């Protein structure tokens, strides 16, 4: 379990990351109290994840999700990023808008997938929404990050 001093009901059972409601509340509190500059919401999705489960089995899919979740818990614990797992393969991070760190996150998740299979049909898609208006609804920020992630689906080059 993560080192979150939180109620178990606020954590997604498989991953141990914040559920949607708690993630949205934590980000809202953070924005209201800290007024950070240069931060973003990141949406992470695994392209064709349902097909991954069909081909390799749900145990392999769960293992992949657990690997990603452990990495994101580490980001929470070491870097104080806010991390969440909304459903299936939908993960979110509130973090500084740092292209180098985003590429590193992509590389780590790509490595986890590559360990399990050798087909480029299952690639991480990462969408970034730069927080420029703190008053915007956090759910809308997450939706915008998901839209950005969906815009790279099917592309081979830049997937962030």
Where on the chain are the PLM-derived regions?
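Conserved acidic
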Residues: 1, 45-48
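Conserved long alpha-helical elements within nucleotide-processing catalytic cores of c-di-GMP signaling
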Residues: 6-40, 47-73, 84-88, 92, ...
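Conserved catalytic/ATP-binding subdomain
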Residues: 21, 136-139
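A structural signal for short, well-ordered beta-strand segments
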Residues: 41, 91, 124-128
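A short pre-motif secondary-structure segment
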Residues: 80-86, 120
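Short beta-strand-to-loop capping motifs
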Residues: 93-97, 130-133
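Short amphipathic alpha-helices in soluble, non-transmembrane regions
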Residues: 105-112
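Catalytic/regulatory signature loops of cyclic-dinucleotide turnover enzymes
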Residues: 117-123, 140-160
């Amino acid at each position: 379990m993560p080192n979150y001093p939180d109620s178990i009901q606020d954590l997604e059972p498989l991953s141990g990351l914040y559920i949607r409601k708690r993630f949205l509340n934590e980000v809202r509190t953070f924005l209201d109290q800290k007024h950070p500059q240069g931060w973003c919401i990141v949406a992470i999705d695994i392209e064709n994840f349902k097909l991954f489960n069909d081909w390799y089995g749900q145990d392999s899919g769960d293992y992949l999700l657990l690997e990603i979740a452990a990495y994101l818990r580490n980001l929470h614990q070491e870097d104080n990023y806010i991390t969440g797992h909304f459903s299936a393969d939908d993960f979110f991070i509130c973090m500084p808008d740092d292209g180098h760190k985003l590429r590193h996150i992509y590389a780590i998740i790509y490595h986890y997938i590559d360990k399990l299979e050798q087909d480029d049909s299952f690639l991480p898609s990462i969408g970034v929404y730069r927080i420029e208006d703190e008053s915007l609804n956090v759910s809308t920020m997450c939706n915008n990050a998901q839209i950005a992630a969906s815009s790279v689906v099917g592309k081979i080059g830049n997937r962030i």
